[in-house]
Regions:
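Ubiquitin-like/PB1-type beta-grasp interaction modules and other compact soluble beta-rich domains
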Residues: 2-4, 8-32, 37-236
Length: 236
């Protein structure tokens, strides 16, 4: 029997690694570019709008913020909660300054130096705003005060800041809340606050004091005419 020839195995074939397909990059069409620019534009517009909204809320809240956190006037020492007339309540003035955010000054401030006029009517009759409100026995005066009984309010501060009606009434030592002035509360005696002859709709305590305002508090039956302006003396 013939001997079978052994076959030499064929050498292994080289296996080529898969090649990454490299198609030439298709240039963007004008429509593609236009869509891309529009998408970027919308994104930027959204970012800008969000920034403006945040800025508006910050500025709005800051501009409407009260000069200080308004204290409960009933908690102020020596506050008068009875009917008019009301005195200047000077004996207890030092104890009211800190909760009102005010200071005992040796001189009138000049950084803020503005004036307002205050009228108060009870059933058509004018109530006197006392002289020397906020001036303590010649020892000190505070940023908000009066020099006479004309109703002129003096706001004189050594630092730039805002002041409100709550602070003036706190210095005066007369209760002022959203519903009560002194002993007059809206549940029993209606009253309204007017600024330059127009009814004020907000919290009366938060009214910011500005130059040459005519402020009128009308309790009960109003006078024939609500004052809308006041003729300040020269220099005020």
């Amino acid at each position: 029997m013939a001997k079978k020839k052994s076959r030499t195995p064929a050498p292994p074939r080289k296996v080529q690694a898969p090649q990454r397909r490299t198609d030439p990059k298709r240039p963007r069409s004008p429509e593609d570019r236009r869509f891309l620019f529009m998408a970027i534009g919308f994104a930027l517009t959204g970012v800008i709008a969000l920034g403006v909204a945040v800025l508006f809320l910050f500025v709005f809240n800051d501009s409407n913020k009260a000069a200080v956190d308004i204290p409960n006037s009933d908690s102020l020492v020596g506050v008068q909660t009875g009917p008019a007339p009301w005195n200047a309540a000077l004996d207890t003035l030092p104890g009211r300054l800190e909760p009102l955010g005010l200071n005992a000054l040796t001189n009138e401030g000049e950084v803020v130096h503005i004036h307002q006029h205050l009228d108060i009517y009870v059933n058509g009759k004018k109530v006197t705003v006392p002289s020397q409100i906020g001036i303590y026995d010649g020892q000190f005066l505070t940023e908000l005060h009066t020099h006479d009984a004309s109703g002129i309010m003096h706001v004189e501060s050594p630092t730039k800041r805002k002041f409100d009606l709550a602070q003036f009434f706190g210095v005066w030592g007369v209760r002022l809340t959203p519903s009560c002035v002194g002993g007059y509360c809206k549940e029993l005696t209606p009253w309204r606050l007017y600024v330059d002859g127009k009814a004020y709709q907000g919290d009366p305590r938060a009214l910011e004091l500005k130059p040459h305002q005519e402020i009128a508090i009308v309790i009960g039956t109003p006078p024939k005419t609500i004052p809308s302006k006041y003729k300040f003396p020269p220099g005020l």
